[in-house]
Amino acid sequence: MTREDSIRQIENYPPFNEQEEKDKALILGWISNNENAFSRENTVAHITASAWVVNKDRSKVLMVYHNIYNSWSWLGGHADGETDLLSVAIREVKEEAGISNVRPVSEEIFSLESLTVDGHVKKGNYVSSHLHLNITYLLEADSEEQVSVKADENSCLLYTSDAADD
């Protein structure tokens, strides 16, 4: 998928609510005004891709306890120059959860959001506060497949039907 294809996919995404409407405009504006929007070399804001991973019968979602944010989250990460954001989301799930059998429920965008990232230390270097302009896809995985922690990014992964209870 080219940069133009990604822009078109975002343009065609129907916002679910006012937050998504505003974030969609922000994301499209940022991409059009920043050649390096898909790279974390842009230290103000950059495109990220995430996955809302459900099991086969759609009764559970895979959540990760993120080390930097100290909170439960869905899986995802930096585009790092890649413009095929669905591929980025799939790659991040495989890397962060250690699973190989993951597939898109749909190739369309599931949600989009602008996420604030507080300043933090990563690999011994300070990273200033910035924005993740995030595109999320709905993926499916086999909840029987063993998940594994990626220690430099997360400390726990689990399938849950109610993340608030865990």
Predicted regions and their residues:
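Conserved Nudix-box catalytic region and its N-terminal flanking loop in Nudix hydrolases
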Residues: 59-100
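A glycine-rich, hydrophobic loop/mini-helix early in the fold
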Residues: 39-71
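Conserved small/polar residues in nucleotide/adenosyl-binding loops
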Residues: 137, 159-166
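Acidic, metal-coordinating catalytic segment for phosphate/diphosphate chemistry
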Residues: 15-50
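C-terminal/domain-terminus segments
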Residues: 145-161
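Short, well-ordered beta-strand micro-motif
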Residues: 53, 138-140, 158
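Predominantly extracellular/luminal regions of secreted and cell-surface proteins
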Residues: 1-23
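Active-site segment of metal-dependent pyrophosphate-handling enzymes
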Residues: 98-145
